[in-house]
From Swiss-Prot:
CDD domains: KH-II_30S_S3 (cd02412). GO terms for cellular component: chloroplast; cytosolic small ribosomal subunit. Belongs to the universal ribosomal protein uS3 family. One of its GO terms (molecular function) is rRNA binding. This is Small ribosomal subunit protein uS3c. Keywords: Chloroplast, Plastid, Ribonucleoprotein, Ribosomal protein, RNA-binding, rRNA-binding. Residues 43-118 form the KH type-2 domain. Disulfide bonds: none annotated. One of its GO terms (biological process) is translation.
Length: 216
């Protein structure tokens, strides 16, 4: 049996960089990791609860965290940043103060920056969210996968692979279905491959979605 390694961890230091950049003493390391998870979860929950999303796509590509002694810098890469900025001019400031209260950072300043992803559907997280939205609306999984591949081709990628696992279309026996278009060289370390795994809760149960995108 072939052993599958995570494509992002496999390429760290060559085409991939770390999502969290900070240094801590060994005794404080676990606290920092928990804080990072809390930040990421809070941002996702805030967007789900406070923003009306018609397409079902939140548009969060990735959240990068950089820490110094007196500062926490959070960079949110979004495909559709208007969702967070539109409506109220002080929305980001309100968002920042709410997060500061939640994290209880007494001696640290919190700074949030939002960066727009130029081609949203070139990012696997946004594509997986799109597929999840389609599956929730009971669109056929094949139709959802084909539409997702069309969107990535329009964004100008070299290859894409999509995999859905679970009780697809409500069938009693769980199975795995996948589709690939173009090249996805998982063995080539120099190849810039973006990857994500995403879970979606449907009326039939939980489905797992995996997306690999070969950009360059």
């Amino acid at each position: 049996m072939g052993q599958k390694i995570n494509p992002l961890g496999f390429r760290l230091g060559t085409t991939q960089s770390h999502d969290s950049i900070w240094f801590a003493q060994p005794t404080k390391y676990s606290e920092n990791i928990q804080e990072d998870k809390k930040i990421r979860d809070w941002i996702k929950n805030y967007i789900q609860k406070n923003i009306r999303i018609s397409s079902g796509v939140e548009g969060i590509g990735e959240i990068k965290i950089q820490k110094r002694i007196d500062l926490i810098q959070v960079i949110i890469y979004m495909g559709f940043p208007k969702l967070l900025i539109e409506g109220k001019p002080h929305k980001i400031e309100e968002f920042q103060t709410n997060m500061h209260k939640k994290l209880n950072c007494v001696n640290k300043k919190l700074n949030i920056a939002i960066v727009k992803i130029t081609n949203a559907y070139k990012h696997p997280n946004i594509l997986a969210e799109f597929i999840a939205g389609q599956l929730k609306n009971r669109v056929s999984f094949r139709k959802a996968m084909k539409k997702a591949i069309e969107l990535t081709e329009q964004a100008g990628t070299k290859g894409v692979q999509v995999q859905i696992a679970g009780r697809i279309d409500g069938k009693e026996i769980a199975r795995v279905e996948w589709i690939r278009e173009g090249r996805v060289p998982l063995q080539t370390i120099r190849a810039k491959i973006e990857y994500c795994c995403y879970t979606v809760r449907t009326i039939y149960g939980i489905l797992g979605i995996k997306v690999w995108i070969f950009s360059k």
